[in-house]
């Protein structure tokens, strides 16, 4: 959001309600929550005996891993573009 106002919305992640506040639109925050929920469910399918805390930490580790891979790919692509200029 560009006007400096905070947006507040309630989301459901892994069966729990969370109220989140941020600078982005409600739809963006819901999308983020949906990705977290999906990732938690995906990990839980492979590791059904994890308690909720371990599941949350493992989800965070996986999401950050994915983020870093994408960031590295972005830097690689930027380097390729720069070489062509």
Swiss-Prot record:
It holds the Pfam family ZapA. The keyword Cell cycle applies. Activator of cell division through the inhibition of FtsZ GTPase activity, therefore promoting FtsZ assembly into bundles of protofilaments necessary for the formation of the division Z ring. It is recruited early at mid-cell but it is not essential for cell division. Homodimer. Interacts with FtsZ. InterPro entries: Bac_CellDiv_Activator (IPR053712), Cell_div_ZapA-like (IPR007838), Cell_div_ZapA-like_sf (IPR036192), Cell_div_ZapA_firmicutes (IPR023688). It is found in: Cytoplasm. The lineage of its organism: Bacteria, Bacillati, Bacillota, Bacilli, Bacillales. NCBIfam families: PRK14126.1. One of its GO terms (biological process) is septin ring assembly. Keywords: Cell cycle, Cell division, Coiled coil, Cytoplasm, Septation. Residues 60-85 form a coiled coil. It comes from the Bacteria. Gene3D superfamilies: 6.10.250.790. PANTHER family: CELL DIVISION PROTEIN ZAPA (PTHR34981:SF1). This is Cell division protein ZapA. GO terms for cellular component: cell division site; cell septum; cytosol; plasma membrane. The keyword Cell division applies. Belongs to the ZapA family. Type 2 subfamily.
């Amino acid at each position: 959001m560009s006007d400096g106002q905070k947006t507040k919305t309630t989301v459901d992640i892994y069966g729990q309600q969370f109220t989140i506040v941020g600078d982005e639109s409600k739809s963006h925050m819901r999308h983020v929550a949906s990705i977290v929920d999906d990732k938690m469910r995906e990990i839980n399918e492979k590791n059904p005996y994890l308690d909720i805390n371990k599941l949350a930490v493992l989800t965070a580790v996986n999401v950050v891993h994915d983020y870093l891979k994408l960031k590295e790919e972005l830097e690689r692509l930027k380097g390729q573009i720069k070489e062509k200029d």
